[in-house]
From Swiss-Prot:
Phylogenetic classification of the source organism: Eukaryota, Metazoa, Chordata, Craniata, Vertebrata
Encoding gene, per UniProt annotation: MAPRE1
Name this polypeptide is given: Microtubule-associated protein RP/EB family member 1
Major place of residence: cytoplasm
N6-acetyllysine modified-residue sites: K220
Positions carrying N-acetylalanine: A2
Subcellular compartments: Cytoplasm, Cytoskeleton; Cytoplasm, Cytoskeleton, Microtubule organizing center, Centrosome; Golgi apparatus; Cytoplasm, Cytoskeleton, Spindle
Transmembrane portions of the chain: none
A molecular function (GO) term: microtubule plus-end binding
Region span, Interaction with APC: 206-211
Ranges where the record places region APC-binding: 220-242
CDD domains: CH_SF (cd00014)
List of residues that carry Phosphotyrosine: Y124
Organism of this sequence: Bos taurus
Amino acid sequence: MAVNVYSTSVTSDNLSRHDMLAWINESLQLNLTKIEQLCSGAAYCQFMDMLFPGSIALKKVKFQAKLEHEYIQNFKILQAGFKRMGVDKIIPVDKLVKGKFQDNFEFVQWFKKFFDANYDGKEYDPVAARQGQETAMAPSLVAPALNKPKKPLSSSSAAPQRPITTHRTTATPKAGPGVVRKNPGVGNGDDEAAELMQQVNVLKLTVEDLEKERDFYFGKLRNIELICQENEGENNPVLQRIVDILYATDEGFVIPDEGGPQEEQEEY
């Protein structure tokens, strides 16, 4: 039977998005580039097969799933495995299959803790177990779109912007600065244009992911700020310490005077 894990709080042990993808890809020998690709449920099914051999009907798992009803079927297989091994976790299938970053990132954070609590270190050949199948490309990778951030960030947004550098190595391996220069004597303008367009699309996806991650962490910081404001009259030293951390700035940082330029314009 499985060891249940109930903690869902954010701790220093939580992996970043980049580290989480690296762990999944290394453990299962996959090539996932986005947390959202976990919405198919296939990776979780194989992790369960790794932890508890025979708990999952792995042959029924659709690693090439591209449609929502296929994702749901995979999660049903996962739920059956959870029930068989006595795992109490309720899987939010309706949210996960929508492919939203926040929902999938929160669930995989829990699953990583569950995995660590149950993994015994035994050898496992993931490619042979799934008979060489690879996961399907996420639908959003086919027609990428560059979205602008939905909310302006205040001075407290400095903290959530720090994870920005974590995504640079998650681009698809096909794109690279040296791709266009391969076989210069043979290639033509159309091929080079196609390669450049592919690189642009990858960069757009990277920016989109970074904006989602920034907004995700900003939302958490904003919720913490609201809780502190609601209880600021209690003179709680812990709350005050949290507020100090929220509003702390890097050494030497100066908040710009937004009124300065307007006043100068009025004088002229």
